Every structure is written in structure tokens, then in C-alpha cells.
């Protein structure tokens, strides 16, 4: 609630890094969506994180690029990732500054991708099935933002009103 006692809806205007991340994610989504509608899955196959390709064919860019690729068969994944990025990322970027925010975003996102790939090497049956599965989306980085936001802003109440 602002100092004047009014109601705040959302975190306010997007900050520079959040805006750039949202625009990039949405642009990549629409390109992959259009490609997928014409039967071309190359974008997801080349930019998504598939541990098998990472380890066997050295697709070393994928722990970074998977953050920008979302499921091209529907809008929900990218929509809610970008909503969370806006809701929580704006406050973090304002608090930390653009450079520190981007560093945190990519460390948590790339870190989540690397952990996912390493877990796929474990001998357990459920983990081994992850070896040939492609991971896409900014969810790892978004969970990192949620953690950072919860640590820095432990008391605020978040109201979800979709009607």
C-alpha cells in the first residue's frame, strides 16, 4: 500500500531489465509458436535444454537459451512466467539495480538448468528418464526471483484477483 493510503495494483511500470527479458521471451515464443504451427520444432530442439544433447553433443549454450524458449503449443506457460517476472522482478531490480538483478536472474536460471541436467545423470529410474526430455522456460529463474523477493520483502500481502 502506498504512503498515501491508496491501493496498488501490480508492481508498477516495468524496469529496463524486466522489460527486456519480457520482450525477448515473448518474441522467442511467437517465433517458435509460428514455426511449430508450420511443423518446425527446430527452435525448441536447438535452444531447449536436453541433457542428452548437452552431454553427448556438447550443446553448451542450452543451459542459457532454454530460459527464453517456452512451450509453443500454448500461451499459459509463457504468460504466467512473464506475469511472475513482472510482479517480482520489478521490485528486485529497483532494490538491486539492473546489473545485479540480471546477474541474479541468470545465475538462478542457468543454475536450475545445470541442476536439472545433472539430476538426469542419477541412476534412479525417474531421474534417468529426464536425460532425453527437453526442458524449456524461465521457471527456474522465476523461482529464484520468488526466493529473492520473499527474503527481501517478507511481509507484503499478495492478492490475486483475476475477475
Residue ranges and their predicted role:
Residues 1-163:
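A detector for small-residue-rich transmembrane helices and their helix-helix packing motifs
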Amino acid at each position: 500500500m502506498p504512503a498515501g493510503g491508496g491501493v496498488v495494483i501490480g508492481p508498477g511500470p516495468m524496469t529496463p531489465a524486466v522489460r527486456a527479458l519480457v520482450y525477448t521471451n515473448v518474441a522467442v515464443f511467437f517465433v517458435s509458436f509460428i514455426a511449430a504451427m508450420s511443423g518446425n520444432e527446430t527452435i525448441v530442439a536447438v535452444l531447449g535444454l536436453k541433457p542428452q544433447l548437452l552431454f553427448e553433443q556438447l550443446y553448451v549454450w542450452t543451459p542459457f537459451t532454454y530460459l527464453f524458449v517456452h512451450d509453443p503449443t500454448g500461451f499459459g506457460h509463457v504468460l504466467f512466467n512473464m506475469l511472475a517476472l513482472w510482479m517480482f522482478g520489478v521490485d528486485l531490480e529497483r532494490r538491486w539495480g539492473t546489473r545485479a538483478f540480471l546477474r541474479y536472474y541468470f545465475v538462478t536460471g542457468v543454475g536450475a538448468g545445470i541442476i536439472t541436467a545433472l539430476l538426469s545423470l542419477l541412476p534412479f529410474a525417474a531421474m534417468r528418464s529426464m536425460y532425453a526430455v527437453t526442458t524449456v522456460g524461465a521457471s527456474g529463474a522465476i523461482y529464484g526471483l520468488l526466493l529473492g523477493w520473499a527474503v527481501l520483502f517478507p511481509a507484503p500481502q499478495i492478492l490475486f484477483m483475476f475477475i
